[in-house]
Amino acid sequence: MPFPAARDRQAIVAFDRLELQRILDLYGRMVAAGHWRDYGLSFDGEVAMFAAFRRAAERPELRIEKRPRLRLKQGAFALVSEHGAVLKRGHDLAGVLAPIERRLMRLVAG
C-alpha cells in the first residue's frame, strides 16, 4: 500500500520550540507553586493547544491556543478560561501569558 502524497496531507499547527519552551517554563513554575499538576497538548490542522490542569480528572483550568489563521486579525495566540471565555488574545505569546505571570507572582508572594 503506497504512502499518501505529501500534498494530500493536511498541515498540522504546532508550537515552535521557543513558544513551547516559554509555556513549559511557566508550567514548571506553576507546578512548583502548587497550582497546576498536569497538562495536555493537542495539535491539529486549525489549532495547537496547551491545557493546564489543577487536577488530572478535571477540565483544564486554562488553555493556551495558537491559531495561525487569526494572526492578521486579533493575533494567533489566545488564553482561554475553563469555561471557554477568551481572557487575552494577541500577536505576542509573552503578552498573552502576562496574566498568568501576574497570578504566579501573587501566589509566590502571598
Please place each PLM-identified region on the residue numbering:
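Secondary-structure transition/turn motif
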Residues: 52-57, 80-84
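Mixed-charge, glycine-accented linear interaction segment located at domain edges/termini
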Residues: 78-105
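Short, charged, intrinsically disordered terminal tails
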Residues: 2, 6-13, 95-110
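Short, highly charged
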Residues: 28-32, 53-55, 60
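Short aromatic-glycine-(Arg/Gly/Cys) micro-motifs in beta-strand/loop hairpins
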Residues: 64-84
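Negatively charged, low-complexity tracts enriched in Asp/Glu with abundant Ser/Thr
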Residues: 1-49
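Short amphipathic beta-strand/extended segments with alternating polar/hydrophobic composition
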Residues: 60-68, 86-93
